[in-house]
A protein has these predicted regions:
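Short, flexible loop segments at boundaries between secondary-structure elements
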Residues: 84-98, 144-154
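Phosphate-bearing ligand-interacting subdomains
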Residues: 102-154
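Flexible, glycine-/basic-rich loop-and-beta segments that form/coincide
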Residues: 1-38
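Substrate-recognition/cap helix-loop segment adjacent to the acidic, metal-dependent catalytic center
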Residues: 71-84
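A short, well-structured juxtamembrane/interface segment
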Residues: 38-56
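Glycine-rich adenosine-cofactor-binding loop
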Residues: 53-71
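Short, solvent-exposed loop/turn segments at secondary-structure junctions
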Residues: 6, 66-70, 92, 124-127, ...
Length: 154
């Protein structure tokens, strides 16, 4: 960051990023309104699915506790009444709680002890590797829920 007309030359990467942002229409308010509408549609779909699962007396656990999971938990109104605990393989996150919602974060060993019916993947960008690493959960009848970029039950 520098002052306008500063002494530093603008790197070509800055021009590239500005060009990409303009191509993606990031300088238009409508882009963000459309994004918000898409997220709210996913929110409604996920809330309806979670309500249906809970109405069937099925259990739901979260999987993955990245920082972005906090945003998802808040925006999608997910709390301990819906999701009892969050599983994370990172020992540094275990035995802690999710910010604000205070959902316990536990080891993945609990999957095979408590056997939740569904795992809501909160680290959706790692969904493939999470499902691959926990194939046994699926073999035992469990299902994975991937909330974004589009809702998938696998």
């Amino acid at each position: 960051v520098q002052l306008q007309r500063g002494v530093h030359k603008i790197n070509n990467s800055v021009h590239k990023i500005v060009k990409e942002e303009l191509e993606l229409r990031m300088d238009h308010e409508e882009t963000y309104q459309e994004f918000g509408e898409k997220i709210n549609l996913q929110k409604t779909k996920l809330q309806n699915l979670l309500k249906k699962i809970k109405d069937e007396n099925k259990t739901i656990a979260g999987f993955g506790a990245p920082a972005k999971s906090t945003t998802l938990l808040y925006h999608f109104n997910i709390n301990p009444a819906i999701m009892e605990y969050i599983i994370d393989d990172n020992k540094l996150k275990q035995n802690l709680f999710s910010p604000g919602k205070h959902i316990p974060i536990v080891s993945s060993e609990i999957i095979y002890e408590k056997r939740p019916d569904y795992l809501l993947i909160l680290a959706w960008n790692f969904a493939e590797s999470i499902m691959k690493n926990h194939q046994e959960f699926k073999k035992q009848g469990g299902k994975f829920i991937i909330p974004l970029p589009r809702l998938v039950v696998n």
